[in-house]
């Protein structure tokens, strides 16, 4: 019996490896993804990987870099995961947060993550505007991200023993942990 060896999770590296191993595997979307409209309704691992890199370069242009935390607070679509993968390419630490949370809960995240970037869309735009403790220059609307130049930058991997991805649970209190 073969036992799989432990490999650390890196969202970007795992996606890249899949794209290299299976470049022509189709990915079918049931809608145009707001943060990845170039993918249309049908793409492949290879083509989606290329656009993930473009989004990473655009995030870098806006100042996102290794070690930064970035809340991804947008409508529930597959592009949320793709944006987290782009952030991971830069060595930033994505925190994918449910778009159902009110501004007051996002303020708790902002405190706990020490003024992270917040990437948002039209679904969460008004709530982000109501967040009082977030630096405005760290608030990135998806529609503005898409307009940024995409100058290539290298991948940065965090040390394997460092947190590279965050999820949350609200438990019974409604406050993120």
Features from the language model and the residues they span:
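A short N-terminal helical cap/helix-turn-helix that marks the beginning
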Residues: 5-31, 50
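Conserved S/T- and glycine-rich ATP-binding loop of Class I adenylate-forming
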Residues: 70, 87, 163, 169-172
